[in-house]
Amino acid sequence: MQYYGLLESTRLASERGRCEGFDRLKYAKGWLKADATPAEEKTLDWEYLRGEIQAHGLRNSTVMAFMPSETSSQISNETSGLEPPHGLVSSKKSKSGVLTQVVPEVETLFNSYTTCWEVADDNRNYLNALGEIMKFNCQAISANTWYVPARHNNNKVPAKILMRDILHARKVGLPTLYYQNTNDEADLESQTGCESGACSI
């Protein structure tokens, strides 16, 4: 996606001019995020793209970014972007009241969803996936992590697990973490609500 976004941006730059401040961007100096990816993993001609950027510049300084979409996803009944859903059925309170949301295509994709509270057992695989996406993203991904205190001794998430996840996020290339969400086991039943195969609302 980033490759073709940048390529299209060079085409637009050749037609309409470079974005303001292009000369201050790393792209102007020949840098590409793909430079951090091992050569054997690359399937596109990044050197060609680098040449096009050098020749024409970019019309857009950012071509790919993932916004937090917790609120906007409710309007379109989508999941929250890169994040796993809170449950197959979940409720969120706002000033306008309580909104109950069912994940898209729950009837057919019931067993395909992984909720954030399932990820909570070990956030590292989720962070690994975000680290791969970050390699080609123009802006920092604000990643959340999840923890269920009831699954730990004395109902407390050990500090070493929190630190492990913070350090792991940095190791895989995530510059920012956002929320460290917690939940007790009592809330998990109401958020999933589909164990029998029929979701309760």
Label the predicted regions:
Residues M1-K33:
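Extended, well-ordered alpha-helical scaffold/bundle regions in very large, multi-domain proteins
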